[in-house]
């Protein structure tokens, strides 16, 4: 044996005996194995493999390990450290396996087990399958590159059975999984880059992985971070995670918590930014962002939970959803201060947030933009929203199939082309307090039994105008507007149909006409159709609308203790097919008509199936403490329609009070107006086929006036003769009065009552203190056509007694009595009756009146069948069908006969008109006069002074105005 060989063997023997050997020579050894508590330090050496066990320790620097093929080939691991207190520590650019870029002959790089410890600083690991395996081992690695040239690599780092591993600035490439921690293992990652073909970071079965200081995680075809199993947890602060299937994924009790992390899909159709399933939880905090996923975050089944505070979600791809919750009843599902949007200005995500199959979600100050639908709650899910902003092109907020959504604290909801809030289906509910809602179609929409309740919410336009502020369609569909609600720039403020219902408290509606496809549509404040109900239970203001309230086979109630207002440019109240409107404490104005009962003929023209007149007879309007003013239009328009209108303590003041001029056939029912302690103003236009009844009672006053604005179909002002005629079928006057307004352009008015048809019942019925006030220009014996007076022509029977008042003036040469004329043509014909009447049907109060302040007495004489005054003169008959058996009530002077002791006027030789009984009294003691009539007691002194002036001026033939009083 040579001396050199002897020295080598001696050195080896010393290592085995004493446990320490400093190798400085360059010889290549196949294997380095240290055990039994021994320690070996090596540097710049190459080994096929090294092994430390049973407390053995290897400290290596700048080593090349496993760079050549193993001998024997069955050896598959380069570095093995096993057993408690065993240690291998490598540094200074040590290479395990093949050099980078070359294929390795070893399958496994490092195996650490049984509480052994492995440390590595710098260098690289390049093997076919797994670079680091820990089985109840401990590891600490820094600045190491791990890769594989194998086409099918395994886990880069696999740690299990309560292993502990710290990785600092580690780079992993070309791995199936970068880190796989199993069975209560703990892995701490600081910085570094981890790339994998499948899942990059895995925590299983109670293991914990913590990533800090901006680690970079990339999965080419799988999940970025994956935690599966109870107590399996991944924590990450800073850095980026890129995934293909899911960027973050947990299930069966796993937990992931990331903060200030950028989560990015890799552009290969990544489905989920963060996906939690089955009792698992993902928390995203700080400025965490999710980009390029088709579903930003998702929690699915068995109390799976997503919590996200701060940050943003950008999604893309077909059917993209910002946040999805499916079959998860976890009350911890929360998004707070999160912005959700499409990642492309030209792309709209399908849904911003979706909750399905009984899921529970809480949103706090969340913003959703660039979505088809902002929020969908389906199949008995629950979403609670505080603040935030939700914009969508389609329906913004949807609750359907028994789901509920609650919005609080001023949320802002916008739909640019559809409904803003939609509740669809039985038990589907939306509650909202405060905030604004803007919809292009409907701001609020309930259908198929859906329910919406909003309080102190403003329903606004979408920049142009909205179709409807709130719409309820279908049986049991309900919208309740609580607190103070404003609706602006909408075509319809409120709309219900097919059995829906809307109620409101304090409500303001400001309408706006809408242009659709070049057609300008009129706006409506409130519209109820098809057996629906609207109840306006608080102060209501409706303005800038064409139609105020519209009811078709439905009911609208605006009965509350507040002061309400309706300002309509066309019609204040429109009734259609058994519609009902109840109004109280309201001030209403309209440009064309105050109340319009729909034109039945127009419905027939339009081919509507509901044009049977019997279906229209129950339309009704009830006004209490309401003022309805139509200065230039019609108070009540009922063209070929039927129904009722009832007033109590109310007013209708119009240019024309009532109009029905399109009645082509005799209606089934009579239209009825009932006024109780109310005021009416305007004339009446009634078609000859129309049947209209006015019931005036309890001190109601109807003032007839000549229309100033009534026009024909061509827009031309009607002749004043047409405008001064009023027609009505039946009039019941109970403790009420009719007043003819002073003449216009020297034209007086005529009120026609009744049709004169055979078997007609009483068409004029007076009871209690019924009164009629006429205007007249005195003449005596003038032809009937030349007499200037208001008239009442009753073409039918009369019942009861009416007090008559007359006022007017006297013209020059018309003050003298015409005793040459027959008695039944003298004076003025005020009232004519074609049917049954009595001499007492119409009487001047106290039986007489005076003229021009003079003491001359005038009476109202009745000429007709069975009259003590004789028959009326047929030449005086003003009815279309001439018949001598009519009644003519005429204002005539009471003349003194030859037996009275009075002498004729010496100049005219005309018998003297009989003086009223009080003549001597009021000439001698004017202050003692008891006077009744149109002038009250406070004015008697002035009146008597005028009387004395008239008497003194008679001899001088002065022409003074006269007022006929009783």
Segment roles from a protein language model:
Residues 33-38, 51-58, 81-88, 161-162, ...:
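Beta-strand repeat architectures
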Residues 55-57, 76, 85, 959-965:
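A common structural microfeature
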Residues 115, 699, 957-961:
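Strand-connecting loop/turn motifs
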Residues 601-612, 709-720, 865-877:
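Surface-exposed intrinsically disordered loops and tails
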């Amino acid at each position: 044996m040579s001396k050199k060989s002897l020295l080598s063997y001696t050195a080896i023997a010393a290592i085995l005996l004493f446990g320490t050997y400093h190798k400085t020579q360059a010889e290549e050894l196949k294997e380095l194995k240290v055990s039994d508590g021994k320690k070996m330090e090596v540097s710049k050496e190459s080994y096929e493999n090294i092994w430390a066990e049973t407390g053995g320790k290897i400290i290596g620097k700048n080593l090349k390990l496993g760079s050549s093929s193993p001998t024997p080939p069955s050896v598959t691991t380069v570095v093995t450290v096993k057993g408690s207190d065993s240690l291998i520590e490598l540094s200074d650019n040590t290479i395990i396996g093949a050099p980078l870029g070359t294929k390795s002959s070893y399958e496994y790089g490092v195996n650490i087990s049984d509480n052994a410890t492995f440390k590595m600083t710098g260098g690289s690991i390049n093997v076919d399958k797994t670079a680091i395996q820990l089985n109840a081992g401990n590891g600490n690695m820094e600045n190491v590159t791990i890769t594989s040239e194998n086409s099918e690599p395994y886990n880069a780092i696999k740690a299990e059975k309560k292993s502990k591993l710290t990785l600092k600035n580690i780079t992993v490439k070309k791995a199936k999984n970068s880190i796989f921690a199993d069975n209560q293992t703990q892995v701490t990652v600081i910085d570094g880059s981890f790339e994998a073909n499948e899942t990059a970071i895995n925590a299983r079965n109670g293991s914990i992985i913590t990533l800090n200081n901006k680690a970079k995680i990339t999965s080419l075809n799988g999940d970025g971070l994956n935690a599966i199993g109870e107590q399996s947890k991944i924590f990450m602060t800073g850095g980026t995670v890129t995934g293909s299937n899911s960027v973050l994924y947990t299930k069966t009790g796993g937990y992931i918590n990331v903060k200030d992390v950028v989560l990015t899909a890799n552009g290969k159709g990544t489905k989920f930014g963060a996906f939690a399933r089955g009792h698992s939880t993902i928390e995203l905090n700080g400025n965490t962002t999710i980009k390029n996923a088709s579903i930003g975050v998702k929690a699915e089944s068995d109390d799976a939970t997503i919590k996200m505070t701060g940050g943003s979600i950008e999604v893309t791809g077909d059917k993209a959803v910002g946040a999805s919750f499916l079959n998860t009843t976890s009350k911890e599902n929360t998004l707070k201060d999160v912005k959700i949007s499409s990642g492309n200005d030209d792309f709209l995500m399908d849904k911003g947030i979706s909750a399905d199959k009984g899921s529970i979600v809480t949103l706090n100050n969340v913003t959703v933009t660039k979505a088809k639908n902002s929020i969908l709650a389906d199949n008995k899910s629950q979403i609670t929203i505080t603040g935030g902003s939700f914009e969508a092109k389609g329906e913004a907020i949807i609750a359907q199939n028994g789901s509920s959504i609650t919005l609080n604290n001023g949320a802002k909801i916008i739909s640019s082309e559809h409904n803003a809030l939609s509740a669809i289906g039985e038990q589907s509910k939306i509650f909202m307090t405060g905030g604004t809602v803007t919809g292009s179609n409907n701001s609020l929409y309930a259908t198929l039994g859906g329910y919406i309740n909003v309080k102190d919410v403003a329903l606004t336009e979408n920049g142009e105008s909205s179709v409807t502020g709130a719409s309820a369609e279908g049986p049991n569909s309900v919208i309740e507007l609580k607190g103070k609600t404003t609706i602006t720039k909408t075509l319809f403020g409120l709309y219900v149909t097919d059995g829906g219902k809307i109620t409101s408290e304090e409500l303001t509606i400001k309408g706006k006409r809408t242009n659709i496809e070049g057609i300008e549509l009129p706006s409506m404040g409130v519209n109820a159709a098809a057996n629906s109900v609207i109840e306006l239970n608080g102060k209501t203001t409706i303005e800038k609308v064409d139609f105020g309230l519209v009811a078709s086979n439905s009911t609208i109630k605006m009965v509350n203790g507040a002061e309400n207002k309706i300002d309509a440019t066309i019609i204040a109240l429109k009734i259609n097919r058994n519609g009902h409107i109840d109004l109280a404490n309201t001030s209403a104005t309209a440009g064309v008509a105050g109340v319009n009962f729909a034109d039945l003929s127009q419905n027939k023209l339009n081919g509507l199936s509901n044009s049977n007149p019997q279906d229209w007879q129950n339309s009704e309007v009830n006004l209490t403490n309401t003022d309805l003013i139509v200065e230039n239009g019609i108070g009540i328009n009922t063209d070929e329609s039927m129904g009722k209108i009832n007033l109590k303590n109310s007013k209708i003041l119009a240019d024309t009070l009532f109009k029905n001029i399109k009645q082509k056939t005799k209606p089934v029912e009579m239209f009825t107006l009932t006024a109780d302690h109310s005021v009416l103003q305007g004339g009446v236009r009634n078609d000859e086929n129309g049947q209209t009844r006015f019931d005036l009672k309890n001190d109601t006053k109807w003032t007839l006036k000549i229309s100033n604005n009534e026009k024909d179909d061509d827009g031309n002002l009607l002749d004043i003769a047409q405008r001064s005629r009023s027609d009505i079928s039946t009039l019941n006057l109970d403790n009420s009065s009719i007043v003819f307004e002073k003449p216009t352009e020297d034209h007086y008015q005529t009120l026609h009552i009744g049709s004169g048809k055979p078997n007609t019942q009483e068409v004029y019925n007076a009871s209690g203190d019924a009164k009629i006030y006429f205007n007249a220009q005195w003449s005596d014996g003038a032809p009937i056509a030349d007499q200037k007076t208001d008239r009442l022509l009753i073409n039918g029977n009369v019942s009861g007694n009416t007090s008559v008042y007359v006022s007017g003036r006297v013209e020059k040469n018309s003050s003298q009595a015409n005793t040459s004329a027959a008695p039944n043509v003298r004076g003025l014909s005020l009232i004519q009756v074609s049917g049954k009447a009595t001499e007492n049907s119409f009487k001047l109060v106290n039986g007489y009146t005076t003229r021009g302040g003079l003491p001359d007495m005038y009476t109202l004489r009745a000429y007709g069948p069975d009259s003590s005054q004789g028959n009326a003169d047929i030449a005086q008959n003003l009815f279309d069908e001439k018949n001598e058996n009519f009644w003519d009530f005429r204002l005539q002077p009471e003349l003194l006969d030859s037996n009275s002791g009075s002498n004729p006027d010496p100049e005219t030789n005309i018998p003297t008109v009989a003086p009223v009984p009080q003549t001597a009294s009021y000439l001698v003691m004017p202050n003692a006069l008891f006077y009744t009539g149109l002038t009250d007691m406070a004015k008697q002194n002035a009146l008597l002074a005028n009387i004395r002036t008239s008497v003194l001026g008679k001899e001088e033939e002065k022409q003074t105005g006269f007022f006929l009083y009783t």
